[in-house]
UniProtKB/Swiss-Prot annotation:
<keyword id="KW-0653">Protein transport</keyword>
<keyword id="KW-0571">Peptide transport</keyword>
<protein>
    <recommendedName>
        <fullName>Di/tripeptide transport ATP-binding protein DppF</fullName>
        <ecNumber>7.4.2.9</ecNumber>
    </recommendedName>
</protein>
<dbReference type="InterPro" id="IPR003593">
    <property type="entry name" value="AAA+_ATPase"/>
</dbReference>
<dbReference type="GO" id="GO:0015031">
    <property type="term" value="P:protein transport"/>
</dbReference>
<dbReference type="GO" id="GO:0005886">
    <property type="term" value="C:plasma membrane"/>
</dbReference>
<keyword id="KW-0813">Transport</keyword>
<dbReference type="Pfam" id="PF08352">
    <property type="entry name" value="oligo_HPY"/>
</dbReference>
<dbReference type="Pfam" id="PF00005">
    <property type="entry name" value="ABC_tran"/>
</dbReference>
<comment type="similarity">
    <text>Belongs to the ABC transporter superfamily.</text>
</comment>
<comment type="function">
    <text>Part of the ABC transporter DppABCDF involved in the uptake of various di/tripeptides. Is also involved in the uptake of phaseolotoxin, a toxic tripeptide inhibiting the enzyme ornithine carbamoyltransferase. Responsible for energy coupling to the transport system.</text>
</comment>
<comment type="subunit">
    <text>The complex is composed of two ATP-binding proteins (DppD and DppF), two transmembrane proteins (DppB and DppC) and a solute-binding protein (DppA1-A5). Five orthologous SBPs (DppA1-A5) are present in P.aeruginosa, which increases the substrate specificity of the DppBCDF transporter.</text>
</comment>
<keyword id="KW-1278">Translocase</keyword>
<dbReference type="InterPro" id="IPR013563">
    <property type="entry name" value="Oligopep_ABC_C"/>
</dbReference>
<keyword id="KW-0067">ATP-binding</keyword>
<feature type="domain" description="ABC transporter">
    <location>
        <begin position="5"/>
        <end position="254"/>
    </location>
</feature>
<dbReference type="InterPro" id="IPR027417">
    <property type="entry name" value="P-loop_NTPase"/>
</dbReference>
């Protein structure tokens, strides 16, 4: 199967002022993220706020340049790409944002907003653009006669359908969805998720699905990447990870996810405190101050990602969770 997105040791660091006469500090928002994504597959990226999910999204969509590492889109290395090549790469990777209303122009009719990618990137006539836009509107569950309406005339779920339609107009190879359902009512979330999956099946688009909701992720993901303070904590097939997570942080996230039929035999794992200050990350494992299983080794030695039970995990004591 075709690999459409490859990241190798992707990092993004920011220089932050510490105040007058104190110089600058470095925030490692993204630190050594690697993965491969095939056409028609979904990689879910999960973690708490501040773990680097949105920074990864901005790097993948070329909104920001990574500090180091390699990023390939459809086999094309981003670093060193020419202006024309970058233009094509941006066509190949599109994004759906968390707040659909904020990503739409309130003064422009949605038909014109959906046609804009075609106007910029193709030589289609006005009538051909209109026809393609109305066809896409039908595919996302919107009525073509709403072509002349403005964003404020639609519900939240309809606006997210509009945002998704706009992202799919150029039939990208990769779609990055940053919390696409978190601003929607629960009753609408399932409809939008099913629409994502229908379009993926039709166009064989690869998804990078960013979310903090593991119940939603379970519905859509083929593979899951769990991040903590900019680093991968655990990554592997979704069924394996949900069946038996091997990193204490993943176990805690799943333990906190509401379930219709909870398993009383599984102990509840509660993590204390907040994410550490990224300006002053802890020594050793970044999670050790909140981890109920931490040992002296965790406080002094950074765990490397290693292969264990068909997934990668960054924990010194992951073997104790095998079973």
């Amino acid at each position: 199967m075709e690999t459409v997105l490859t990241a190798r040791d992707l990092t993004r660091h920011y220089e932050v002022s510490r105040g007058l006469f104190k110089g600058h500090a470095q925030v490692r928002a993204l630190n050594g993220v690697s993965f491969e994504l095939e056409a028609g597959k979904t990689l879910a990226v999960v973690g708490e706020s501040g773990c680097g999910k949105s920074t990864l999204a901005r790097a993948l969509t070329l909104i920001e340049e990574p500090t180091s590492g390699s990023l390939k889109i459809a086999g094309q290395e981003v670093k060193g790409a020419s202006k024309d090549q970058r233009r094509q790469l941006r066509r190949d990777v599109q994004m759906v944002f968390q707040n659909p209303y904020a990503s739409l122009n309130p003064r422009q009719k949605i038909g014109d907003q959906l046609a804009e990618p075609l106007l910029i990137n193709t030589a289609l006539s006005r009538e051909e653009r209109r026809e393609k836009v109305q066809q896409m509107m039908r595919q996302v569950g919107l009525r073509p006669e709403h072509y002349q309406r403005y964003p404020h005339m639609f519900s939240g779920g309809q606006r997210q359908r509009i945002a998704l339609a706009r992202a799919m107009m150029l039939q990208p190879k990769v779609l990055v969805a940053d919390e696409p359902t978190s601003a929607l009512d629960v009753s609408i979330q399932a409809q939008v998720l099913n629409l994502f999956m229908d379009l993926q099946q039709q166009f064989r688009t690869a998804y990078v699905f960013i979310s903090h909701n593991l119940a939603v992720v379970r519905h859509v993901a083929d593979d899951v990447l769990v991040m903590y303070l900019g680093r991968p904590a655990e990554m592997g097939p979704a069924d394996k990870l949900y069946e038996n997570p091997l990193h204490p942080y993943t176990r805690a996230l799943l333990s906190a996810t509401p379930a219709i039929h909870p398993d009383p035999t599984k102990p509840k794992i509660r993590i204390q405190g907040e994410l550490p200050n990224p300006l002053h990350p802890p020594e050793g494992c970044a999670f050790h101050k909140r981890c109920p299983y931490a040992t002296e080794r965790c406080r002094s030695e950074v765990p490397e990602l290693r292969l264990l039970d068909q997934r990668q995990v960054a924990c010194h004591h992951a073997e104790q969770f095998l079973g």
